[in-house]
Amino acid sequence: MTAPAGIDPRGPRFAAWITSALLLVATVLGLVAGSSPTSISFGWFAYQPLADATYISGDFAFIAGRPFWLQILLLRAAQPAFILTFVIALLFLWGVLSPRTQPWSLLFRTLVRPRLAPPRELEDPRPPRFAQGVGLLVVTVGLVLHLLGVPWALPIATAMAFVAAFLNAAFGLCLGCQLYLLLQRAGILGRAPRLP
């Protein structure tokens, strides 16, 4: 088995800067919005409706008239922190499935790398790709738990992913890459490449 062609190690760090900025914004949005809604408030009314009257909400056209559990689910999914984290999860998925066509990779290759000196050494692309998968797992768990109504699940998940992305961007410490190497040494992931 031959090792795949190496990548410029500055590329994943560049992508980690952008990802950490997005994750920081998602974390702040999640903290500002608070925990996920568990009830629907229709605001203040000038009259008291009859006890047996049924009120159908008109707050959002796509929510009105739906079952209560679906209304709550749609309200949770419409929060800005959820939407941004969902976009970040899609970017992580893109990085796992096709790292060469991921937007941050294209941006680095077309705008940044031509202005830099060639790298001294190339890096195995498998650990950074695995790290993208770990990031995808963490934010996906946060998204699912948020939809299920677990308080603070989304900002905690985005904060964890932010810490990992920031460590990679600022210090070159890729936690997902370290996990990949640990699992590789344990024989769980592939085989360690043999040195000639």
Task: Go through the PLM ranges and name each one.
Residues 1-196:
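Membrane-interfacial helix-loop segments of redox and metal-homeostasis proteins
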